[in-house]
Amino acid sequence: MAIYRLAELLETRFRRSFLKRAWIAKTPRAVLARPDSFMNVCGPVVARLAKSFGQPLVVHDDLDLPLGALRFRMKGSAGGHNGVASVIAHLGTPDFPRLKIGIGRPASKADVVDWVLTRCEGADRETFNGAVGRAAEALRSALDTGLDRAMTELGT
């Protein structure tokens, strides 16, 4: 969702690339891409995109961050995130930047899959939507001023 909000801010639109198996929006400053696959198995598509366009900055949800929190990281482990593990496996390295959007954890461990796949409602939805907007602004800042400065501005 943050990548779509960023596309709006940059006044560009996504187009489907069957060759790359992704939705792609090109701008003078960056190529935005959303793999046309489930997050858990997006690694092959991200690796293909990286070969064409350079190192990715991956945006993903994070159970270990409170709902609405944002955090840039320059590299790191998958932290239990299957989609990030897929990207690491197919890029062959954990050394790529990422922006994590906190979704918090459910009350019960058994509910994790449903928690990740279900839309939040009410006040949680407002908090999440606010985080998506802030994430898009942070990504635009990274394009405008560089990732290091955007990380400082975000406080991560």
What are these regions (language model features)?
Residues 1-75, 85-99, 106-111, 126-155:
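Nucleotide and nucleotide-moiety/phosphate-recognizing core
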Residues 80-83:
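Hydrophobic alpha-helical segments within soluble ligand-binding/sensing domains
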Residues 121-125:
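Active-site oxyanion-binding pockets that recognize sulfate/phosphate
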Residues 71-78, 116-120:
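Short glycine-enriched, charge-decorated loop/helix-capping segments at active-site entrances
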